[in-house]
Amino acid sequence: MASPRFNSIIIILFICTISLSIVSISCKEDLKTNQAALFAFGDSLFEAGNNNYFDSISSFRSNFWPYGKTTFKFPTGRVSDGRIMIDFIAEYAWLPLIPPNLQPGYSNSQLTYGLNFATTAAGVFAGTFPGSVTNLSKDLGTQLNNFKNVEKTLRSNLGDAEARRVISKAVYLFHIGANDYQYPFFANTSTFSNTTKERFIDFVIGNTTTVIEELYKLGARKFGFLSLGPFGCTPSALIINSTKIGSCFEPVTELINLHNQEFPKVLRRLERRLSGFKYALHDFHTSLSQRINNPSRYGFKEGEMACCGSGPLRGINTCGFRNGPSQGYKLCENADDYVFFDPSHLTETAHQQIAELIWSGPPNVTAPYNLKTLFRL
């Protein structure tokens, strides 16, 4: 027969167990209530599958093998072999995977965790890569309008006060503009015959700023931005000039460098002008350039050659028979050895490294806040 002391110990342990369970449940509920959402806007760097729901031409889709082969084991629409930086940032923020906003079937509760509006080939302008989808727009203005619809749904489902809390606490992450600078050369347009490079950059940044201000009017306060990467030095860009294989495409490089000089000035002006406006700006250009130019320092074997593609540096965009079965492609054995998965897009490993810098990078990499700090505000 058990002693009274033993019975007392059992009772105390039982009470402690119940108490810990209650605390655990309370903490989880508190996390759900106070967790900041993540809303993403942009282009193929953040694409999580929206293009699956467009009538897109095949060269702008990634819902076929070998995309997605590393982690998901099937193509999700992400333009990578696996996860992208949005996925990692969501993980660091204790959020579920953030779904593409066009994906059917997500629950209303998912809206309180965020949505991804980014789409391959999207630009600030509606006229950037206009033939990539049929009878639809996916530019930054359209992405803003899609968010406005979500905002209305949040107000309808949660009430005005709770919707305002979700919107003000959320983080809004952007990567946009690179396609606007690449498209004039891709399509051989007369853009720069009619306007100066500086004026064109003003248009790109000005339209981006308008969207930021519209989100601010809706209650958004915390923003994250990536500078534009060295897209004149991707495998696809390195083979544009057949007489200089391996050389960066200078016209795009020049525009991106000018953009990256001007955009931080605009953000500082917004910070001074808009009460409560806080932001993180990650120097994506430097982070990616370092990995292209010195891959072994970051655990890669190849910085300029793509894992999947054809031709010199696998820089021709035929990955997964993208342009039909008549155009074959080569696929590397281990994507983790490569910075680029296809001629223009990063591997999961590269995405993860960049995501870590956006999340918790020091002030010389991500400033004036990093995303970890923004999520805690």
Swiss-Prot record:
An MF annotation (GO) of this entry: lipase activity
InterPro entries according to UniProt: GDSL, GLIP1-5/GLL25, Lipase_GDSL_AS, SGNH_hydro_sf, SGNH_plant_lipase-like
PROSITE patterns recorded: LIPASE_GDSL_SER
Keywords assigned by UniProt, alphabetized: Glycoprotein, Hydrolase, Lipid degradation, Lipid metabolism, Secreted, Signal
EC number in record: 3.1.1.-
Matching Gene3D superfamilies: SGNH hydrolase
GO BP field: lipid catabolic process
Pfam families: Lipase_GDSL (PF00657)
GO CC annotation: extracellular region
Residues of this chain annotated as glycosylated in UniProt: N135, N188, N194, N207, N241, N364
Intracellular or extracellular location(s): Secreted
Catalytic machinery residues: S44 (nucleophile), D342, H345
Alphabetical list of CDD domains matching this protein: SGNH_plant_lipase_like
Entry similarity comment: Belongs to the 'GDSL' lipolytic enzyme family.
Protein name: GDSL esterase/lipase 4
Species, as recorded: Arabidopsis thaliana
Encoding gene (name): GLIP4
